[in-house]
């Protein structure tokens, strides 16, 4: 039944694609719901009397409407914003350099490498450098690893995630080059992490089947997919 359902490709509420694994010489037919609200209603909410969602990122400003709509919650569902105990205006600064090439330029990664080298030396490490591309991550890491005097460099993949975080915490003037899982869910207390450098904003690849289908659906409704979804 599952094979017939996927093979028919005729349910507009689902996204279909084929994944090819060249190493194992096989392929997968994949189907996933375009929207998950009805699936959650049928398979989760109906079985529960109460449910609590908590996260640092489910509200936009102090508005939960986007989150509620996307997972099938009623607009009058109770919500609450618990404000941060940190005084961000006094405890942090955000810098956006205006003299770095566009990420699509061929010189971008080389320019970023020089910029990072100067910044990491000045800050004496204690930094996460977050990438959206493994190729850029590896290129910059191997370019800088022999020039970062007195700074201990760690790269995503050199050890399991938890072990790598522990290595960073116990490192001397550490810098961690990471992607994917290091963008969220990592908590480094104290002065061992004093800066986070985002090399490029983590927009999803437009050619990803799920992303592409969601963008097409939003556009078909006459809405701006960049504002409504990607940002």
Name each model-derived stretch.
Residues 1-231:
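ASCE RecA-like P-loop NTPase motor cores
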């Amino acid at each position: 039944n599952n094979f017939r359902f996927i093979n028919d490709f005729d349910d507009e509420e689902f996204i279909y694609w084929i994944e090819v694994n060249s190493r194992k010489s096989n392929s997968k037919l994949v189907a996933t719901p375009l929207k998950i609200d009805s699936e959650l209603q049928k398979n989760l909410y109906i079985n529960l009397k109460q449910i609590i969602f908590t996260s640092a990122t489910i509200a936009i400003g102090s508005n939960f409407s986007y989150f509620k709509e996307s997972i099938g919650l009623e607009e009058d569902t109770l919500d609450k914003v618990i404000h941060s105990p940190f005084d961000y205006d006094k405890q942090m600064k955000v810098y956006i350099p205006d003299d770095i090439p566009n990420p699509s330029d061929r010189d971008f990664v080389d320019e970023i490498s020089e910029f990072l080298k100067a910044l990491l030396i000045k800050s004496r490490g204690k930094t996460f450098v977050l990438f959206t591309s493994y190729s850029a991550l590896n290129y910059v890491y191997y370019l800088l690893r022999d020039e970062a005097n007195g700074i201990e460099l760690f790269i995503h993949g050199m050890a399991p995630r938890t072990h790598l975080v522990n290595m960073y915490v116990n490192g001397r003037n550490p810098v961690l080059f990471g992607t994917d899982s290091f963008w969220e869910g990592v908590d480094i207390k104290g002065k061992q992490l004093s800066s986070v450098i985002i090399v490029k904003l983590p927009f999803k690849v437009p050619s990803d089947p799920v992303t592409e289908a969601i963008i097409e659906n939003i556009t078909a409704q006459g809405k701006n997919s960049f504002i409504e979804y990607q940002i």
